[in-house]
């Protein structure tokens, strides 16, 4: 990985976490020490109900705060929606968009994901765009084609190393304990890099590509050593600061 692509370890809490969980946020802030700060960025994405309190507890720690989703519209009659501006107002700097759970369960299209990327940009947020194939698509030999289509159709013009992160999450590996082989990960991440180059030229070499899918302390070192893997999008293992920090510590220095 080029030195310009700083490792990013991001934690997605999904629909987990109550006020009592802020103790884990405090532990995360305390554990992000000088050695970790020297080698990687650390980002945590708790549920929206905890964002403001989490921002207060993370202040000055260097741990970044992210949202799990944003509405494509800036404001208006969208009951239950959370805009990018609201996230920014809460202290957020990044936002996950296009997570497979939303693509699958809520039928979010590539076009909707692209609209969310643009919404994030409007308020200075860094979108983490998720792509990945289902088990059925993988078994049918369609993984490369699916991921290529998602990258092409989810990203607007103007993507750069400073305004975009990609996360490859094989849907069949999320929360299942199954992980693809390092060779499989390298193949898809290499494909994503090639697609980014075809769309954005040399700028693509600086765009970070994360791996997400049952990342744990005991497999992090192997996964993070794969070519074109620039970090991780961690699910369940990010809920406990000790586990999340263990993944960060297991990540090889670049």
From Swiss-Prot:
UniProt record similarity statement: Belongs to the triosephosphate isomerase family.
Keywords attached to this entry: Cytoplasm, Gluconeogenesis, Glycolysis, Isomerase
Protein name, per record: Triosephosphate isomerase
PROSITE patterns: TIM_1, TIM_2
Cellular compartment(s): Cytoplasm
Active site: 99 (electrophile), 169 (proton acceptor)
Function as written in the Swiss-Prot or TrEMBL entry: Involved in the gluconeogenesis. Catalyzes stereospecifically the conversion of dihydroxyacetone phosphate (DHAP) to D-glyceraldehyde-3-phosphate (G3P).
SUPFAM superfamilies found in the cross-reference section: Triosephosphate isomerase (TIM) (SSF51351)
Name of the gene this protein is made from: tpiA
GO cellular component, one term: cytosol
């Amino acid at each position: 990985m080029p030195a310009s692509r700083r490792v990013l370890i991001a934690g997605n809490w999904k629909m987990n976490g109550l006020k009592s969980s802020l103790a884990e946020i405090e532990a995360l802030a305390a554990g992000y020490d000088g050695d970790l700060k020297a080698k990687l960025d650390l980002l945590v994405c708790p549920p929206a109900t905890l964002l403001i309190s989490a921002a207060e507890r993370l202040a000055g720690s260097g741990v970044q705060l992210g949202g799990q989703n944003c509405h494509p519209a800036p404001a208006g009659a969208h009951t239950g929606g959370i805009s990018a501006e609201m996230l920014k107002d809460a202290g957020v700097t990044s936002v996950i968009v296009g997570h497979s759970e939303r693509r699958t369960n809520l039928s979010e299209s590539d076009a909707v994901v692209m609209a969310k990327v643009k919404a994030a940009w409007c308020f200075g947020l860094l979108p983490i765009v998720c792509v990945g194939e289902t088990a059925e698509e993988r078994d049918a030999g369609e993984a490369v084609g699916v991921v290529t289509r998602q990258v092409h159709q989810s990203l607007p013009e103007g993507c750069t190393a400073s305004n975009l992160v990609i996360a490859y999450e094989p849907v069949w590996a999320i929360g299942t304990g199954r992980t693809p082989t390092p060779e499989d990960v390298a193949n898809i991440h290499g494909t994503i890099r090639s697609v980014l180059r075809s769309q954005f030229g040399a700028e693509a070499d600086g765009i970070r590509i994360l791996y997400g899918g049952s990342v744990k302390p005991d497999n992090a070192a192997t996964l993070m050593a794969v070519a074109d893997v620039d970090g991780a999008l961690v699910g369940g293992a990010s809920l406990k600061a000790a586990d999340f920090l263990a993944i960060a510590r297991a990540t090889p220095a670049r």
